[in-house]
Amino acid sequence: GADYFCLIKPEVTFLVLIATGLGCYMAAQGALSLWTLFHAVLGTALVAGGTATLNHYIERDLDGRMRRTAQRPLPSGRLKPREVLNFGITLSVLGGAYLAVFVNLLTSVIGLLTLLSYLLVYTPLKRKTSWATFIGAFPGAAPVLMGWTAVRNSAGLEAWVLYALLFAWQFPHFLAIAWMYKEDYARAGMLMLPQRDPEGNRAF
């Protein structure tokens, strides 16, 4: 049970849900339906948990090379790859379907596009370019957009302003982690910014 809970990266998922709730609140302008909030948060939690779990599966070999992640359920051998893959797919499909049925199709589509861009674009790029951090900020900012569309079923200028703010907010967080664990990332072959700029003078 604890290992499966670890797979959804609860700390990251919690931040995703905060962003989703913020998007709902801002879109509702004081008239937020608690049921809409509940369905948006639950559906997003399932998609986010599925994304995190599938990321564990994809990066299981890299995680085994990093001290920070070597004790995760897959590299430590506590769970088998097939179990993790099945769990991740199940969460993702349930989340997408839940959002489509109980929220709206637009929010479901954004959620699934976020999952695909995170796993199929950002994740493999981490081994190829330090610009992966910039690319990863696009799906990273999507939860606030999903919260907005859950209420409005559309994304106007205000929604994109919120998206841009969350997009920009991620960089200090990303860069701080990349700097703190630069040796780990180098060992795993991930091309984070500190590998190109060991003195820490650059933000891009």
For each feature predicted by the language model, list its residue ranges:
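Small-residue-rich segments of transmembrane alpha-helices in multi-pass membrane proteins
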Residues: I18-G21, P73, I135-V151, G200-R202
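N-terminal, positively charged, Ser/Thr/Ala/Gly-biased leader segments
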Residues: G1-E11, L15-L22
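Membrane-interface helix caps and helix-loop-helix hairpins in membrane proteins
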Residues: A100-L106, T123-W131, W148-S154
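Multi-pass membrane catalytic core of lipid/isoprenoid biosynthesis enzymes
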Residues: R60, R68-V109, E199-F204
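Membrane-embedded alpha-helical segments that form the functional core of polytopic membrane enzymes
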Residues: I18-L22, M26-R60, R68, V109-L120, ...
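Alpha-helical transmembrane segments of multipass membrane proteins
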Residues: G21-Y25, V93-Y98, L116-P124, V144-T149
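Cytoplasmic-side transmembrane-helix entry/capping segments in multi-pass membrane proteins
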Residues: G111-T114, S130-A141
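Cytosolic, membrane-interface loops and tails of multi-pass inner-membrane proteins
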Residues: G1, I58-L79, L175-N201
